[in-house]
Amino acid sequence: MPLNLEDKKAIVSEVAAVAASAHSAVAAEYRGLTVTEMTELRAKARQSNVYLRVVKNSLARRAVEGTDFACMQEGLVGPLVLAFSQDDPGAAARLVKDFAKEHKKLEVKLVSVGGQLLGPGELERLASMPTRDQAISLLMAVMKAPLDKFARTLNEVPGKLVRTVAAIRDQKQASA
């Protein structure tokens, strides 16, 4: 069933709005995936807060025009599914990477972050980025480490004194 002009405009505006607020985008070729597998991918995308959509390439080119993902326009060829990360820059990459491990027919074509077009090989690097919460906890651990070491050092002085006095006591008791 062909789309009329109003439907096309609605799709373009919806994808453009999502692309304008997204942190990263991944385009993957889904040729050979069954309907069940695509439904499974969509369900996982909803759980990860990733916007996933199959859009005609001409409409996708119009939708990403004027956004950070305009660099993807030339590469939008073939049957592609677009995944946009809403909260976490690595969410779409993790979703596609994990799904592609199980389903070899899902092939990554384009990866884009912050207006830069990355190769399909960069998907692994983007997917391994920590989430916001993980990054904050790593930063806090790094900031807390010197304080912990300082506290242990201060605690060591009285501990060493106690061990020395105990050793002298044991030595005197042994000689007596």
UniProtKB/Swiss-Prot annotation:
InterPro entries: Ribosomal_uL10, Ribosomal_uL10-like_sf, Ribosomal_uL10_bac, Ribosomal_uL10_bac_type, Ribosomal_uL10_CS_bac
Ribosomal protein keyword on record: yes
GO terms for MF: large ribosomal subunit rRNA binding; structural constituent of ribosome
One GO biological process term: translation
Cellular component aspect of the GO annotation: large ribosomal subunit
Pfam families from the UniProt entry: Ribosomal_L10 (PF00466)
Coiled-coil stretches noted in the UniProt entry, renumbered to this chain: none
Keywords: Ribonucleoprotein, Ribosomal protein, RNA-binding, rRNA-binding
Record function comment: Forms part of the ribosomal stalk, playing a central role in the interaction of the ribosome with GTP-bound translation factors.
Similarity comment: Belongs to the universal ribosomal protein uL10 family.
Quaternary assembly: Part of the ribosomal stalk of the 50S ribosomal subunit. The N-terminus interacts with L11 and the large rRNA to form the base of the stalk. The C-terminus forms an elongated spine to which L12 dimers bind in a sequential fashion forming a multimeric L10(L12)X complex.
Protein name: Large ribosomal subunit protein uL10
Organism for this UniProt entry: Thioalkalivibrio sulfidiphilus (strain HL-EbGR7)
Organism ancestry: Bacteria, Pseudomonadati, Pseudomonadota, Gammaproteobacteria, Chromatiales
